[in-house]
Amino acid sequence: DFNDGPGIDEFEKLFGHSGVEIVLGTTPDPALHLTDPHATMALQSKVGLTPTTARFYIAPQKRFFEALLDFIMVSPDLAAKAPDWRIWHPFNDPRITAIPDLADALLAASDHFPVTVDLSEVI
């Protein structure tokens, strides 16, 4: 949980990169970079299409704001094995939407949704 992300990070103003980009790796050597496909999608998006892992109610506007704040970053050797990343978002994951009790529990538990990486098939 970075509580920041691409475009909303104070470090971006100071260092020219968001905290997420810094942790993913900014060195020229890709072997030293971590991987998170959701972060990559957000960093490459030019129109604001990005996965989200958190949902906050903005009372004055009477609406919800969503952001990508939670990440699981893995090394290049694990990423090369194509593990299955998942954001347990009750509105954006049809497998969760199909189970109303699970969707309700995720909404009640936190303003952040779990992020998992299934490595069972790759290790």
Question: Predicted segment positions?
Answer:
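Metal-dependent phosphoester-hydrolase catalytic domains
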Residues: 3-123
